[in-house]
């Protein structure tokens, strides 16, 4: 699993601050079809640092499925994030604003999210789809930036 990310001439991919998540449907016995993240039903935690801005690239490649619901939460409630790009195009400055981290993501679409935490702890990206009893969680461990 991996995306094709197109950058502007001279722009470099920032491996430390860009985190990509590809959502799809996998077949894992004995469960049948289930949501997976980056090719696995049990993704490893991603370590983030406090005070650091990250670009979370969300890509929905599920086929013939309903829209996904993506929610990033800490302590049971959505955290704040900022949608900065949609389907490969940066959003105009007038549309850039922080909001509760909860949105729909249609089949074949992408969203780039800006996320920064000011405190240590654990947050989870919860991905769900209508018709699937279970949801999948991508854990994040936020550590103090040294």
Please give the residue ranges for each predicted region.
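Copper-binding active sites and cupredoxin-like electron-transfer domains
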Residues: 1-146
């Amino acid at each position: 699993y991996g995306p094709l990310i197109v950058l502007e001439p001279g722009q470099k991919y920032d491996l430390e601050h860009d985190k990509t998540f590809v959502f799809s449907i996998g077949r894992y016995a004995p469960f049948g079809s289930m949501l997976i993240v980056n090719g696995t039903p049990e993704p490893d935690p991603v370590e983030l640092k406090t005070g650091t801005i990250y670009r979370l690239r969300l890509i929905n490649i599920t086929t013939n499925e309903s829209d996904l619901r993506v929610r990033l939460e800490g302590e049971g409630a959505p955290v704040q994030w900022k949608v900065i790009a949609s389907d490969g195009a940066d959003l105009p400055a007038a549309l850039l604003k922080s909001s509760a981290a909860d949105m729909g993501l249609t089949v074949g679409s992408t969203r780039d999210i800006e996320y920064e935490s000011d405190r240590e702890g654990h947050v989870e990206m919860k991905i769900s789809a209508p018709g699937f009893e279970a949801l999948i969680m991508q854990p994040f461990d936020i550590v103090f930036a040294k």
